[in-house]
C-alpha cells in the first residue's frame, strides 16, 4: 500500500512492478498522481488497485485499513495492518493528528510514528522560508514533540514496539528524536521506564525484525 505520491514514497514503484509484477494499492487521488508521473508507461492498469479511507481491504491473511491524513498530497492516507489478532500501524507524513487519527491507532502492537524534525533546527536551518512554513503547517510533518504527544495518546497494553520514523536528514538526528520523545512521555505521562521497545527507524536500512 502507498500512502501518497511524493517522490520519496513512490520512486521505487516502477522497478518493483517491472521486476516483481507487484500490485500497487493506493487511494484514487494517489493512483491518478502516480499515473501522471509514470512517463514510461511501465505501470499498467492491471497493477493498480484503489483503496478508500475507512474501508478495510483483505490482502491475503492481512486486513489493511487506510485512514485519512493531513498532508499536502492528492489523497494521503496512513495504514493499519491486522493479522492473527495483532495490529501494526503506520502513521507518517502527518501535518497534524486528531481524535480520528488516535482512534485508528488505538490497540496497536507495533507503531511506526513520524518524528520528522526538531523545530529549532528547522527554523535555524537553510531551508527556504516557504518550505519551513509548509513543514510546520497542518499539512506538513510532525515534530519530535508532536510525535511524543501522539504516542502518549495511543500507548496501550498491547503496544510492544514503537519506531520513530521519517526523520529529516537536515533538521533532525536519531538521538535527538529519541530523547525528545522520551522527554515528552515523561512530561505528559510520567513514564520513565517503558513497557515497550522505543527505537528510531534507520533511513537507509531495514528496521529490525520483530516477532509478535
Please report, for each region that a protein language model flagged, where it lies by residue.
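Active-site metal-binding motif and surrounding structural segment of the metallo-beta-lactamase
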Residues: 1-29
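Active-site metal-binding loops of divalent metal-dependent hydrolases
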Residues: 5, 29, 69-72, 92-94, ...
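Core dinuclear metal-dependent hydrolase active-site scaffold
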Residues: 11, 50-110, 209-212
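Metal-dependent catalytic neighborhoods of phosphoester/phosphodiester hydrolases
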Residues: 11-20, 35-38, 172-179
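Short active-site oxyanion
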Residues: 19-24, 87-88, 196-197
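Short acidic-hydrophobic, aromatic-tinged amphipathic segments that line or gate anion-handling sites
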Residues: 48-52, 200-201
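Cap/insert and terminal regions of metallo-dependent hydrolase folds
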Residues: 99-200
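Short, basic/aromatic-enriched C-terminal tail that caps enzymatic domains
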Residues: 196-212
Amino acid at each position: 500500500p502507498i500512502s501518497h505520491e511524493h517522490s520519496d514514497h513512490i520512486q521505487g514503484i516502477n522497478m518493483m512492478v517491472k521486476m516483481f509484477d507487484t500490485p500497487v494499492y493506493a487511494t484514487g487521488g494517489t493512483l491518478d498522481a502516480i499515473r501522471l508521473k509514470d512517463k514510461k508507461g511501465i505501470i499498467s492498469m492491471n497493477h493498480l488497485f484503489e483503496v478508500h479511507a475507512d474501508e478495510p481491504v483483505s490482502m491475503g491473511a492481512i486486513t489493511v485499513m487506510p485512514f485519512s491524513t493531513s498532508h499536502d498530497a492528492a489523497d494521503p492516507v496512513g495504514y493499519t495492518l491486522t493479522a492473527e489478532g495483532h495490529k501494526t500501524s503506520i502513521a507518517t507524513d502527518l501535518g497534524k493528528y486528531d481524535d480520528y487519527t488516535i482512534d485508528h491507532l488505538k490497540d496497536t502492537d507495533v507503531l511506526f510514528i513520524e518524528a520528522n524534525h526538531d523545530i529549532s533546527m528547522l527554523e535555524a536551518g537553510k531551508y527556504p522560508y516557504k518550505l519551513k512554513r509548509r513543514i510546520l503547517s497542518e499539512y506538513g510533518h510532525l515534530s519530535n514533540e508532536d510525535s511524543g504527544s501522539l504516542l502518549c495518546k495511543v500507548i496501550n497494553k498491547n503496544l510492544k514496539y514503537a519506531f520513530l520514523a521519517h526523520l529529516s536528514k537536515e533538521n533532525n538526528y536519531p538521538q535527538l528524536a529519541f530523547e525528545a520523545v522520551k522527554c515528552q512521555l515523561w512530561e505528559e505521562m510520567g513514564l520513565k521506564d517503558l513497557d515497550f521497545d522505543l527505537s528510531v527507524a534507520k533511513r537507509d536500512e531495514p528496521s529490525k525484525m520483530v516477532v509478535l
